[in-house]
Amino acid sequence: MLGGISIWQLLIVLAILVLIFGTKKLKNLGSDLGGAVKGFKEAVDKDTEAEDGKTAQHKVIDADVKKDDKSA
């Protein structure tokens, strides 16, 4: 799991972080990080929408569906 890191090692590291920084700072850090990720995703989505609008071409594909009547 994760390159040899067990769940117990992760829990110990988390407990040490809580002791050092406190839950309030970790909560603020988590919300700030989440806001940054959300802002990044929105910026990427806006860029891809702008690019799609410039190069969007509609394609129509006509095809016939053939049914295979082979039974096993």
From Swiss-Prot:
Q: Which Gene3D superfamilies match?
A: 1.20.5.3310
Check the UniProt entry and state the signal peptide residues, or none: none
The subcellular localization recorded is:
Cell inner membrane
Q: How does it sit in the membrane?
A: Single-pass membrane protein
Q: Which GO terms describe its molecular function?
A: protein transmembrane transporter activity
The regions listed as transmembrane in this protein's record are: 1-21
Tell me the domain of life.
Answer: Bacteria
PANTHER family in the cross-refs? SEC-INDEPENDENT PROTEIN TRANSLOCASE PROTEIN TATA
> What's the subunit arrangement here?
The Tat system comprises two distinct complexes: a TatABC complex, containing multiple copies of TatA, TatB and TatC subunits, and a separate TatA complex, containing only TatA subunits. Substrates initially bind to the TatABC complex, which probably triggers association of the separate TatA complex to form the active translocon.
Q: What does this protein do?
A: Part of the twin-arginine translocation (Tat) system that transports large folded proteins containing a characteristic twin-arginine motif in their signal peptide across membranes. TatA could form the protein-conducting channel of the Tat system.
State the family named in the UniProt similarity comment for this chain. Answer: Belongs to the TatA/E family.
Question: What is the name of the protein in this document?
Answer: Sec-independent protein translocase protein TatA
Organism, as annotated:
Marinomonas sp. (strain MWYL1)
